[in-house]
């Protein structure tokens, strides 16, 4: 029995146990997000159907009394263009168990680094972290697996997350560390994040401001050796803006990756313009154009998949996203 069939059977089993749902407050959720795109890398072009981080998951919480709660979240990625399951594993997007209360929350398992959510995720507003228009330059240092994490209660709008990812005796492996902070002041939201594993590290800071129908934001990041081994340090920034008008959203986004100190001409720029039309709170149709211009030694590509040195890429896409 293949992985996808096992995953489907597990989903059916969970859906069928209505008593367990009632006792554990389990929720089935997900997203199907697919685009038709014309992509071009240098002189090579292709037109096709592309998955954009489609996923489904289960999450639940049990009230243990005295303000203490136990919870879990299991999330699986799949390819919406073909139906194939995530090659990394059934619940490779997220698999965690947690305890929360007045003390904050303790989390164990696999989940996305909070340093990413505190900074880059907020600034990729047009389609968040999905697809070829996603951030090509953000240095994601923290491993997702084998994590122990703690989240503080919120104090005056400030929340802090800290995590360690254990290497579990892997040959040459080192523990990784992640620290993030979010400070919400109504229309103004601030964030910062730091990650480190061995000599590879990154620090980023973000600001997002909403006024009327407009939202503007940006982040700056400094990393060391994240994309290029022994490349040295690199500075990156990204700016984004959005305007909402009824069901329509208009987005513009530009990012700039500086060259690594030990790798001359490794800099690049990414431009994105996008339009979303919200058919409902859960469903939207959208289109975007994004382009990555690499300098002579730059290798940045869509979905952070490297291309040949100096190769420029662009794509024109239309898509449908439905959340459930």
What are these regions (language model features)?
Residues 18-22:
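Sec/Tat signal peptide C-region and signal peptidase I cleavage site
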Residues 23-38, 44-169, 173-175, 182-186:
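Outer membrane beta-barrel
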Residues 24-30, 62, 66-70, 102-106, ...:
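Outer-envelope beta-barrel architecture signal
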Residues 29-35, 73-75, 109-111, 161-165, ...:
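Transmembrane beta-strands of outer-membrane beta-barrel proteins
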Residues 42-45, 225-228, 258-262, 302-308:
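Extracellular loop and loop/strand-boundary signature of outer-membrane beta-barrel proteins
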Residues 47-51, 88-92, 141-143, 170-176, ...:
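Transmembrane beta-barrel outer-membrane domains
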Residues 148, 179, 311-324:
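Outer-membrane beta-barrel "beta-signal"
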Residues 176-278, 290-291:
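Detector for outer-membrane/organellar transmembrane beta-barrel domains
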